[in-house]
Amino acid sequence: RTICGISSGGACAFNAAWHGPEHFGRVISHCGSFTNIRGAHNYPYLIRSTPRKAIKVFLQSGELDADIVTGSWALANQQMAAALDFVGYAYRFEFGTGGHNLRHGGALFADTLRWMDADT
């Protein structure tokens, strides 16, 4: 099954897959809040220090994504992508020029679903 979310919902979708990969093996996160909000900033370290799980991940963010006191969404998503790459996850990271919205992610969504269904 695939789980999807934007912003805190994107981090929540990843959290659900991380803790229940037998239920959700594919995650789509648009502008995921992997910043210092309820511990989501810890995921890059957890990914790097935990044996790889059976999860396929799509991340999307942009250079104008949110940047507030809890952190930079653009940098946080780049850190997530780097951690996933480090461990050898099947992942895709689309980094665009947009902000904290679904314009970019929505434009990619059909292709994202095709990629999610493809064997990696």
What are these regions (language model features)?
Residues 1-120:
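Non-catalytic cap/lid and distal C-terminal segments of serine-dependent acyl enzymes
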